Curated annotation (Swiss-Prot):
PANTHER family: MANNOSE, PHOSPHOLIPASE, LECTIN RECEPTOR RELATED. Heterodimer of subunits alpha and beta; disulfide-linked. GO terms for molecular function: toxin activity. This is Snaclec macrovipecetin subunit alpha. It comes from Macrovipera lebetinus. PROSITE patterns: C_TYPE_LECTIN_2 (PS50041).
Amino acid sequence: DCPSDWSSHEEHCYKVFRLFKTWEEAEKFCTQQVNGWHLASIESVEEANFLAELVPKTLIKSKYHVWIGLRDQSERQQCSSHWTDGSAVSYEKVVRFTKCFGLNKDKGYLEWVTLPCEDKNPFICKSWVPH
């Protein structure tokens, strides 16, 4: 089972943090929680819909986008092929590519938005359900 204040979906645990961190600070924060946590990867439309429902429960009437575990690490303006937790990008919902990715507050957290990695936003950590 997931820790008591985390939410579960499929075989993963999630938590939205109301802390304002840059993308790198947020990823570091997730990895320091428990071994194996990262900024959330989104690997299906079902997972995207789950997170779109989860975020507003924590960030009530939020004016902020929410970091997810994807960023462009190349010189060319192309998306990285892997999430920070190492899983392959098999599902994409994005309009244009630049640097770091978040869930778009103006689209009900269903669409991705590219943001400067130095912006400070809330974020979602994700890991496998502990066995």
